[in-house]
Amino acid sequence: MGNVPAKETRSRSSSSVSDYRNSTSSTTHGSSSSTSSKRRNTTSSLYGIVSSATSSSNHHNRSGSHDLRKLKRQEEKEQAQIQHYMQLIVKFNESVDGGYLAPFGTYKSNLDYDCDIVRNLIINRKLSPFFTPLQDFDESWTDDELCILLGQLTLHALEPGYNNDDDEEEDDIDNHKIHKSANYYKRQEEKAKLKSLINKVKELQKDEEQKYFDEKQKNFNKDCPSRDLLLRLYRNASECPICFLYYPKHLNISRCCLQPICSECFVQIKRLDPHPPHDDQSNQEAGELPHRLISEPANCPYCASPDFGVTYEPPIDIHTGIDGIKPGDYRVSPPIVEESESAIDDDGDNSSNGSTTGKGEITSNSATAAAAATATPPPVNSISPKKNSLKKRRGSLAANAPGVITIDMIRPDWETKLNSARSKLARKAATASAIHASNLLLDDNSNSNSNNGNGNNSGNNRRRNNSSSGRSGSFGGSNNRYATVEQRMIEEAMRLSILDEEERKRNANKENKK
């Protein structure tokens, strides 16, 4: 009996055993639950690593493709620039009616016209070629004196005929800054490439000049103009009213006021850069921005008529160079002069008399006529002075008339530049509107906070008691402000997009009406 535990002892011991069992079971359950949670965490972490790696690879692929496209566009731009400058080289074997396909070099700037379009217009005889100009001309010069002077002319101006020289290079604003901008080094690299390209073009032009001089000394190259061709072109030279240089009289004629202009001056005329309208704003269309950019057509340098254009009538007795005979094969033929009716009657009487005199005289007269016809063959495109003097003077032509070459035809990228400038201005306006809207919201928030700060202590106690709700409310307010700013930015972008689309439709309608 003495070894049997008491009632209190039995209860305590049993309770301790049960507690041990409960603690053991709880420990086992806790360990199993922790193990399962670790497994879940490991699985989720592995999934996160895989997903992050996948997204990272996708991001790298997208960025890589974007860089490749950007690099390709840059290469295409550089190739187009190289091709443009190579087409500005004057080559003596690329001539049309005594002129050339590239400018002489009177001007050093504004050579950004489309060379392919201008070359095709010259080859098709729709635009006057680039003739080599004379600094002075005197009608009293003899043919020998004029030929000596023409023989000393070069293909291109002796002075550097291209811009971006060291003395005319534009000063970069970042040159005076300690911290350079992000695009500074890129601009410097592009300037260095352009300078190298221009130096290369100058060397190629010098080689072409030397080749032309050597061929003239040999005096048997058919690509060099003959004496007859030079005299035919420059015997009655005319002065260009803009550059005051003397060219062959076959120049472009303005469509509006019928004034002559050389091709060298014609390609210099261009539209102004996109700018805000400077006229009366009362005629501005509804919904249009007050700082909307426009691009006005080029005006005539003589009469200031809008949408300047020219026409060209090629000489009918000269067809040398491309799609014609060699310039060295050109020979002047005497023009056919119309005979009067009395002369024809006299010839008829003489022929009748000759027929009655005898058979031998008839044979001799026919032989003489055949010999004369063989010695002086009639020119293909020659006309009589009488018909030429009766040519009627034409009036002004419309800009879209057949045969009219406008400034926009040789610079067709003006609309692309205008749209680019408008998009840039729209982005600036949207950014300014977003900043203005955010400043308004911040001002409203500061005013509300200052009004709340003027309250009594009970308000402070309520804020201390409701600190958690206050924090959540502040987060909600900031999110609402950001959402409002974003919404305003989206609305502004949509409004600008709608205005651009309306402007495009108006321009399309105007073009269709024309």
From Swiss-Prot:
InterPro entries: Sip5/DA2. Residues 64-79 have a biased composition (Basic and acidic residues). Residues 340-349 have a biased composition (Acidic residues). Residues 12-36, 445-481 have a biased composition (Low complexity). GO terms for biological process: cellular response to glucose starvation. Residues 1-79, 340-396, 442-481 are annotated as: Disordered. It comes from the Eukaryota. It is found in: Cytoplasm. CDD domains: SIP5-like. May negatively regulate the SNF1 kinase. This is Protein SIP5. It comes from Candida albicans (strain SC5314 / ATCC MYA-2876) (Yeast).
